[in-house]
């Protein structure tokens, strides 16, 4: 059965690996959303991948997403993978740092979901929100990541609330809190650190989870980590 899979934050790291992995199945129709679409040029020749410019750091996220989604009959899977990381001491965080972190990591995610839900209600779908171990309660926290980690904690809370609101529908919602994977974002947070898991390895797990986990779980906040970092 053909599946329409929307991947937000597809231009690099885990998101780009997800496009590679999920597009190998010709029955998957991939909608890749990214602020920087140039890095996705290698997928232009694939008939089952469509690429759209999409910026979460704007006031028009919901309307932009609705415009993109109007071209698909339904959405089977939405993977909210995009993220903004600011690594600064707490007292050096500007209001702009805080607003952008929450706009990209929380508000933009919620508005994207608002646009996607009408495309899921009839046949059902799986929303996978990507959070971080930094936002998972009770784990080790790191100085300099106050804006990032608190916003990712909000993503986990949003997942639980959304799951409750839509528990009587065909929509399933889950959240993966990722530990260290070798990505550009990890390098920004912990320069020089070598993660035990590659972006591709993490993407393989997320792809399988996105395709299958909705069959037996809903509203789950799941740590996916060997190290933090």
What are these regions (language model features)?
Residues 11, 19:
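N-terminal Rossmann NAD(P)H-binding glycine-rich loop of SDR-like oxidoreductase domains
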Residues 81-86:
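Conserved NAD(P)H cofactor-binding loop of Rossmann-fold oxidoreductase domains
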Residues 89-90, 97-99:
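Substrate-binding pocket helix/loop in short-chain dehydrogenase/reductase
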Residues 113, 148-151:
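Active-site helix of classical SDR
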Residues 132:
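Residue(s) in the substrate-gating loop at a strand-loop-helix junction
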Residues 140, 161-171:
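Active-site-adjacent segment of SDR/Rossmann-fold oxidoreductases
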Residues 168, 175-176, 191-229:
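C-terminal helical subdomain
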């Amino acid at each position: 059965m053909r599946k329409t899979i929307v991947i937000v934050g597809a231009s690099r790291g885990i998101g780009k690996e997800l496009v590679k992995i999920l597009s190998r199945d010709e029955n998957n129709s991939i909608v890749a959303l990214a602020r920087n679409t140039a890095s996705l040029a290698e997928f232009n020749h694939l008939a089952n991948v469509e690429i759209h410019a999409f910026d979460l750091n704007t006031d028009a996220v919901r309307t932009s997403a609705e415009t993109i989604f109007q071209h698909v009959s339904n959405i089977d899977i939405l993977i909210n993978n995009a993220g903004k990381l600011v690594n600064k001491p707490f007292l050096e965080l500007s209001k702009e740092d805080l607003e952008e972190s929450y706009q990209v990591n929380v508000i933009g995610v919620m508005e994207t979901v608002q646009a996607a839900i009408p495309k899921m209600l009839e046949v059902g779908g799986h929303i996978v929100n990507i959070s971080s171990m930094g936002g998972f309660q009770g784990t080790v926290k790191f100085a300099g990541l106050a804006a990032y980690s608190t916003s990712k904690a909000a993503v986990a809370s949003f997942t639980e609330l959304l799951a409750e609101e839509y528990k009587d529908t065909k929509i399933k919602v889950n959240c993966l809190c990722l530990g260290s994977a070798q990505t550009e974002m990890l390098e920004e947070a912990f320069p020089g650190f070598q993660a035990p898991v590659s972006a591709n390895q993490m993407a393989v797990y997320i792809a399988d989870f996105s395709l299958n986990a909705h069959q037996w779980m809903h509203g789950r906040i799941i740590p996916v980590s060997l190290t933090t970092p």
